[in-house]
Amino acid sequence: REQNTTLFDTRCVVLGYGRCGSALCRRLAALGAKVTASARRREQLARIYADGHTPCDINKLSPALDGCEVVFNTVPAPVLPEELLRRLPPEALVVELASAPGGCDAAVAEAMGLRYRNAPGLPGKAAPRTAGEYLGQVIRGLPHWEE
């Protein structure tokens, strides 16, 4: 519903490679997306590479965002300031999955014309099944063709 194309061959960036980010990357890759995942620690970056995704240091996001079509944020801290949002093409979709304060300012993203969807606070630790079902709904909603 959010895209007019499927996720197949779509350039996606996932910010954070914890429980939610790593699960999301696996599912996006299974749908044929070109997945870049970001993390802070070298061990996480190595795991991203070993899992078959393109790793990116979260402090060096600019190149990964150039031409990116969908950004999923799982980091509950401001990691997408305005200067990085400006790297995204105008038709990009930003999906906020992290709890407050989230990764970017929704008002700034929307003022720039980006499509911003807020789906924060997935309770992965308290209710992993429910969190997984909700995340599945978000993912299933993305690859549909626009009618």
Where are these regions (language model features)?
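Accessory recognition modules or surfaces
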Residues: 1-12, 44-53, 70-72
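Adenosine-phosphate binding glycine-rich loop
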Residues: 1-9, 103-147
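Residues in the short beta-alpha loop(s) of Rossmann-like NAD(P)-binding domains
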Residues: 18, 40-42, 100
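Rossmann-like adenosine-cofactor binding region
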Residues: 48-123
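Glycine-rich adenosine-cofactor-binding loop
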Residues: 8-29
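NAD(P)-binding Rossmann-fold cofactor-contacting core
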Residues: 30-51
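Short glycine/serine/threonine-rich phosphate/pyrophosphate-binding segments
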Residues: 20-24, 45-48, 102-103
